UniProtKB/Swiss-Prot annotation:
One of several proteins that assist in the late maturation steps of the functional core of the 30S ribosomal subunit. Associates with free 30S ribosomal subunits (but not with 30S subunits that are part of 70S ribosomes or polysomes). Required for efficient processing of 16S rRNA. May interact with the 5'-terminal helix region of 16S rRNA. This is Ribosome-binding factor A. GO terms for biological process: maturation of SSU-rRNA. The lineage of its organism: Bacteria, Pseudomonadati, Spirochaetota, Spirochaetia, Leptospirales. InterPro entries: KH_dom-like_a/b, RbfA, RbfA_dom_sf, Ribosome-bd_factorA_CS. Monomer. Binds 30S ribosomal subunits, but not 50S ribosomal subunits or 70S ribosomes.
Amino acid sequence: MNPIRRRKIEAEAVRTVAMMILSGKVKDPRVHMVSVHRAEISEDGKNMKVFVTAICTDKKKIKVLSGLNSASGLFQATLSGKLGLRITPKMHFLWDEEYIQSLDESLRLTRKPTNTD
């Protein structure tokens, strides 16, 4: 797949999922207060990983991911309609550990005491 086309699909997927969650089109009560960070489409264009986070416990995290994965068909249909895709990638929602780690690192650095005598 063309890299420019791939980035366009990934960006539109992030935008579409975020807007559908914010606008309330996803009726699943497990899906709320979710941040969509990035998407990665496979080389063949058949699968897409969508990375998300939310402020919740580990137990609730599983429910959030389950709710998103159960609504993936709705996201896929909307994305296909917006981009006119012949093959719509199957969306798989994953917790964005990389984003969480970068936040933790930023917080750690800002809280680091400085010695100014």
